[in-house]
């Protein structure tokens, strides 16, 4: 056991480790968000006894856990590591031992992050860690330093993973698989890896300078010494904006596969989808200052960032309409992954609308640091990235584990989380339009109504998460029985494809990519000889 899991160089085992880790961190992050919602359920001090520093520490912890320890390990480390080699017909990742250290850098990073909240009074900076609040004057203890170390370790982990994905994709494709024939999920991970490679060094530089300011008496961000805190914002957001695309582009890849399978159609405009993802990735590097409209940028700078940000809506729209065109006229089967995919399309588009509103510098001056922004990025992440993780799990886990989940429970879990997240985040738009500021644990009584509704929603979402954990256990314990039951319910009455070839019909899920042609679960070494794809 120790040999297999601790020293593993097998992409599948490492992917499973990533997945277990991300579920654990996701539960911790959800716990933090529940405490935040409990505190905000009513005006005045509710649960934290007036400890506003603790509130901000929880906000920081929630954000960093969800972004760096849930979404990225699950989508890139979990699904990416498991499926990318299978989809391109590779025996493993290009650098298996590098893959191992990529994972094992994350638990120490988690230890640093948790420690940072426990020493002194925690890092109450928000996940952006803006100077001067994160400076040595305002946060005198080791908390922020520990948070910076956590960011450093997750950065190195992701960077090594990105190098691995790029080399694997370029060098280890099977015979006949040109770049044009790669599945969309492989393209998504490939583009994500480039985003990581180009943006993470900038974050590392920015927080390293902050570390120097805090401990070695430099003044990169100290105005008294000739520095400028706005430099930190530029460095952080030059990473921070590509980061949100790092989280959503793998989700795009997952959704493409699911929409295609459950509509029984190839994705509409497959090459356009690749170009759209690449355009989103490129444009993501040219828009970072739209997070900084209120720091005193020039008028023409603001005009540029407004226009450039709106241009990102074009390739995103291409993707949305291509998915809709894939569904249109298809033979649709509303299995659980497809329900998540359709919910993704609807809610991600809503999040995109609010994003276009926030792109306007003139409007953003009013919306900046209000709950409108919180509502916007939670629609995109909590109902974009997270829904695609659930979709991908329900889509691929029966094949990865060889064990089926309980279909009915999964549908209940979908409806619970669908209702829950909307009840949480829809009212936040109204609060934001009325000017309720972010990251403040107390608020005027006028905001009480919608905040109460939002907190009710968080309980619904929490129940769905608990149900998901039960579904996981049920899948591991009763997976084979579920397989028999599910077949009679869905696959026999409404198979994905019906062919005259019986060998083909026995394969329950039919896709255009090769990972489902393997055994279920796949062998430890899936391809000893290259799979020929044409």
Curated annotation (Swiss-Prot):
Q: What is its main location?
A: mitochondrion
Q: Which residues bind Cu cation?
A: 241, 290-291
Q: Name one GO molecular function term.
A: heme binding
Q: Which pathway does it operate in?
A: Energy metabolism; oxidative phosphorylation
Q: How does it sit in the membrane?
A: Multi-pass membrane protein
Q: What interactions and quaternary structure are annotated?
A: Component of the cytochrome c oxidase (complex IV, CIV), a multisubunit enzyme composed of a catalytic core of 3 subunits and several supernumerary subunits. The complex exists as a monomer or a dimer and forms supercomplexes (SCs) in the inner mitochondrial membrane with ubiquinol-cytochrome c oxidoreductase (cytochrome b-c1 complex, complex III, CIII).
- Origin, by domain of life? Eukaryota
Q: Which residues bind Ca(2+)?
A: 39, 44, 441
Where along this sequence does the record place binding of Mg(2+)? 368-369
Q: What does the record give as the organism's lineage?
A: Eukaryota, Fungi, Dikarya, Ascomycota, Saccharomycotina
Q: Where in the cell is it found?
A: Mitochondrion inner membrane
Name by which UniProt lists this protein: Cytochrome c oxidase subunit 1
Q: What's a single GO BP term from this record? A: mitochondrial electron transport, cytochrome c to oxygen
For binding O2, which residues are annotated in this chain's numbering?
245
Crosslinked residue numbers (1'-histidyl-3'-tyrosine (His-Tyr)): 241-245
Q: What does this protein do?
A: Component of the cytochrome c oxidase, the last enzyme in the mitochondrial electron transport chain which drives oxidative phosphorylation. The respiratory chain contains 3 multisubunit complexes succinate dehydrogenase (complex II, CII), ubiquinol-cytochrome c oxidoreductase (cytochrome b-c1 complex, complex III, CIII) and cytochrome c oxidase (complex IV, CIV), that cooperate to transfer electrons derived from NADH and succinate to molecular oxygen, creating an electrochemical gradient over the inner membrane that drives transmembrane transport and the ATP synthase.
Give the EC number(s) under which this enzyme is classified: 7.1.1.9
């Amino acid at each position: 056991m120790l040999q297999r899991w601790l020293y593993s160089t097998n992409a599948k085992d490492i992917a499973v480790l990533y997945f277990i880790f991300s579920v654990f961190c996701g539960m911790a992050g959800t716990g933090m968000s529940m405490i935040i919602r409990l505190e905000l359920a009513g005006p005045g001090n509710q649960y934290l006894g007036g400890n506003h520093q603790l509130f901000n520490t929880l906000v920081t912890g929630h954000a960093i856990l969800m972004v760096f320890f849930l979404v990225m390990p699950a989508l890139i480390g979990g699904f990416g590591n498991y499926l990318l080699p299978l989809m391109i017909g590779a025996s493993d990742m290009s650098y298996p031992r590098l893959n191992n250290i990529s994972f094992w850098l994350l638990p120490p990073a988690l230890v640093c992050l948790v420690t940072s909240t426990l020493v002194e009074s925690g890092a109450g900076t928000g996940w952006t860690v803006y100077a001067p609040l994160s400076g040595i004057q305002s946060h005198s203890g080791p908390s922020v330093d520990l948070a910076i170390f956590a960011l450093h370790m997750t950065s190195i982990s992701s960077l090594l993973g990105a190098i691995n994905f790029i080399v694997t994709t370029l060098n280890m494709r099977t015979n006949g698989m040109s770049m044009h024939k790669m599945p969309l999920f492989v393209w998504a991970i490939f583009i994500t890896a480039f985003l990581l490679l180009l943006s993470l060094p900038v974050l590392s530089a920015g927080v390293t300078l902050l570390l120097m300011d805090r401990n070695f008496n430099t003044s990169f961000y100290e105005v008294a010494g000739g520095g400028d805190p706005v430099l930190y914002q530029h460095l952080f957001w030059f990473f921070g904006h590509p980061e949100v695309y790092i989280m959503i582009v793998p989700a795009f890849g997952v959704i493409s596969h699911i929409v295609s399978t459950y509509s029984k159609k190839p994705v509409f405009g497959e090459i356009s989808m690749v170009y759209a993802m690449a355009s989103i990735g490129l444009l993501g590097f040219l828009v970072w200052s739209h997070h900084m409209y209120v720091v005193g940028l020039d008028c023409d700078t603001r005009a540029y960032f407004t226009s450039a940000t709106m241009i990102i809506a074009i390739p995103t729209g291409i993707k949305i309409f291509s998915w809709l065109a894939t569904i249109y006229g298809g033979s649709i089967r509303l299995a659980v992954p497809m329900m998540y995919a359709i919910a993704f399309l609807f809610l991600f588009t809503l999040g995109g609308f609010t994003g276009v509103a926030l792109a306007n510098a003139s409007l953003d001056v009013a919306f900046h640091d209000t709950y409108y922004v919180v509502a916007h990025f939670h629609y995109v992440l909590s109902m974009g990235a997270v829904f695609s993780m659930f979709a991908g799990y329900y889509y691929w886990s029966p094949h990865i584990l060889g064990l089926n989940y309980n279909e009915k429970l999964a549908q209940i879990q979908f409806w619970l989380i669908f209702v829950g997240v909307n009840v949480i985040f829809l009212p936040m738009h109204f609060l934001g339009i009325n000017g309720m500021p972010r990251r403040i644990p107390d608020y005027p009584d006028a905001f009480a109504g919608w905040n109460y509704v939002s907190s009710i929603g968080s309980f619904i979402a929490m129940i769905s998460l608990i149900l998901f954990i039960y579904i996981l256990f049920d899948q591991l314990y009763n997976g084979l029985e579920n397989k028999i039951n599910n077949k009679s319910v869905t696959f026999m009455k409404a198979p994905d494809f019906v062919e005259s070839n019986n060998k083909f019909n026995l394969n329950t899920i039919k896709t255009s990519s090769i990972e489902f042609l393997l055994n279920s679960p796949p062998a430890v070494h899936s391809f000893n000889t290259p799979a020929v794809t044409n």
